[in-house]
């Protein structure tokens, strides 16, 4: 089993781990930054959860940057894209339509070594997706059916419920996500509260060993130790408006230098540098999404001028 992927999954749990401590906690920082308990961080996140659970809409600007080092074996046609810096930006609005189903309008752009492409995706009702991506799909809008996005899917309550259920399952299996963080701090500045923390990789791997149904072999433990030493950065932060408690920004940084023994298993990958930054705005401000006229049903044979057939 390739354990090199485990830290990437663990970073995704960083935000969830912030709010998994027990107790209500209290207090905070009136300026600068100070260390806080998991319970205190959890109380800040609870206030944010309460503020977003009935949210009807929000704007967002998400930027993902990835740098992969090494000569990736077997990358094929994607080699040029993977051998240099890659960035993806998603910018738009998402919320609830009048009927209670989800709606969204998102512009996206992917930049990579040797090229780029951009497009737009929208849905006025959560039932039909409309996509415009000239480089890959040709001119005009294309439509394809979506499974209906209900009101929970459009807001935060469904996500919060799923996260809570996932944390409960981990705890029942013997893991404690509340201990996955270190260097936890809370700062207040310019009308924002910011929670920051590093992922405790050693504790994450210890919990992985605990909950593993098939057990951890000596070889697995060696790999996990190598991965733990290879990780240079696993940091996350969440910012909220101090008055409304609505999220304003989220950032995740992850960096890893693979040792030679892991590079072979990772198809020649030597390093990973990832940065995700999401800014939130326009909370509960309605927006209009209209189905584009003249959209044609999506046909994969039209991809890349017929190469998708």
Place the predicted regions along the sequence by residue.
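Bacterial N-terminal signal peptides that target proteins for export
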Residues: 1-8
């Amino acid at each position: 089993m390739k354990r090199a992927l485990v830290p990437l999954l663990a970073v995704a749990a960083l935000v969830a781990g912030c709010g998994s401590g027990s107790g209500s906690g209290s207090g905070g920082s009136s300026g600068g930054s100070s260390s806080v308990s998991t319970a205190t961080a959890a109380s800040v996140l609870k206030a944010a959860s309460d503020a977003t659970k009935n949210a009807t809409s929000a704007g967002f600007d998400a930027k993902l940057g990835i740098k992969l080092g090494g000569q990736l074996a077997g990358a094929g046609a994607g080699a040029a894209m993977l051998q240099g810096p890659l960035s993806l930006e998603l910018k738009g609005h998402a919320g609830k339509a009048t009927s209670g189903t989800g709606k969204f309008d998102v512009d996206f752009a992917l930049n990579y070594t040797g090229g780029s492409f951009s497009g737009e995706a929208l849905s006025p009702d959560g039932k039909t997706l409309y996509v415009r991506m000239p480089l890959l799909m040709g001119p005009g809008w294309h439509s394809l059916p979506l499974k209906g996005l209900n009101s929970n899917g459009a807001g935060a309550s469904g996500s919060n419920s799923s996260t809570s259920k996932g944390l409960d399952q981990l705890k029942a299996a013997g893991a404690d996500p509340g201990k996955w963080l270190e260097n936890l701090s809370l700062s207040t500045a310019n009308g924002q509260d910011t929670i920051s923390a590093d992922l405790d990789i050693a504790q994450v791997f210890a919990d992985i060993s605990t909950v593993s149904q098939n057990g951890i072999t000596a070889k697995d433990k060696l790999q996990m130790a190598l991965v733990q030493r290879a990780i240079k950065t696993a940091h996350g932060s969440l910012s909220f408006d101090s008055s409304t408690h609505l999220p304003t920004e989220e950032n995740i940084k992850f960096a890893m230098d693979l040792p030679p023994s892991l590079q072979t298993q990772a198809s020649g990958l030597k390093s990973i540098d990832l940065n995700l930054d999401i800014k939130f705005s326009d909370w509960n401000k309605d927006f209009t999404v209209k189905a584009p006229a003249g959209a044609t049903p999506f046909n994969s044979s039209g991809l890349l001028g017929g190469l998708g057939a």
